Amino acid sequence: MSKEIPTPYMWSYQPQMGLAAGAAQDYSTRINYMSAGPHMISRVNGIRAHRNRILLEQAAITTTPRNNLNPRSWPAALVYQESPAPTTVVLPRDAQAEVQMTNSGAQLAGGFRHRVRSPGQGITHLTIRGRGIQLNDESVSSSLGLRPDGTFQIGGAGRPSFTPRQAILTLQTSSSEPRSGGIGTLQFIEEFVPSVYFNPFSGPPGHYPDQFIPNFDAVKDSADGYD
């Protein structure tokens, strides 16, 4: 009975390539029942068989069906596209420029701004011109002037997504093309559930997975010393 209940193969992760670096049986998880009686041995075998059933069910749920157990390059459609954490930027505030925007009715799109040098002076003044138009708003406001706090709504309608007192801009980056190749640690845990391999040494040697051989090389995708 105990020989028919295999010890699962635990997969290891190759972080540089994002691949599985092979699997080995973890005999440290086996319960020592050498001095136990038949009743205890039967209970231990029942626990081991139940564990293997759980692993088989988990593999059926989380593992992606594929011909190659450990592909060298995962297609983008099968790779988790992890979004990087957003970046928070503190916006600079220029009280003098905001007052000039309000007084001049600055326009967000169109118009222009230029610097005027006063005759006989070396000081450059910032001049902003516009018509005080708020862009793309479904509701018509009674006042067409810009807000005195310098907060503008460029697109959409309704209330802006930030407050004047919260001068913080959150940026979310994303890649222009989906990533392919190796997989991350989270996907590795789901894809490479501990393997339950029944009767591993009953068939021809060529049918035994290379990944289960101790000297398997993940870089060469082969086991050293084996053809």
Swiss-Prot record:
One of the record's GO cellular component terms: host cell nucleus
Post-translational modification: Cleaved by the viral protease during virion maturation. May cause the middle segment to be shed from the capsid.
Modified positions (Phosphothreonine) in chain numbering: T64
Residues modified as Phosphoserine: S118, S174
Keyword terms of this UniProt record: Capsid protein, Host nucleus, Late protein, Phosphoprotein, Virion
Annotated site location: Cleavage: G111, F112, A157, G158
Induction: Expressed in the late phase of the viral replicative cycle.
Taxonomy, superkingdom: Viruses
InterPro entries (UniProt xref): Adeno_PVIII
Stored Gene3D superfamilies: 6.10.250.1460
GO molecular function, one term: hexon binding
Transmembrane segments: none
Propeptide positions: 112-157
Family, as annotated: Belongs to the adenoviridae hexon-linking protein family.
HAMAP family: ADV_CAP8
Quaternary structure and interacting proteins, as annotated: Interacts with the peripentonal hexons as well as the hexons in the facets. Part of a complex composed of the core-capsid bridging protein, the endosome lysis protein VI and the hexon-linking protein VIII; these interactions bridge the virus core to the capsid.
Misc. comment: All late proteins expressed from the major late promoter are produced by alternative splicing and alternative polyadenylation of the same gene giving rise to non-overlapping ORFs. A leader sequence is present in the N-terminus of all these mRNAs and is recognized by the viral shutoff protein to provide expression although conventional translation via ribosome scanning from the cap has been shut off in the host cell.
Protein name: Pre-hexon-linking protein VIII
Native organism: Human adenovirus C serotype 5
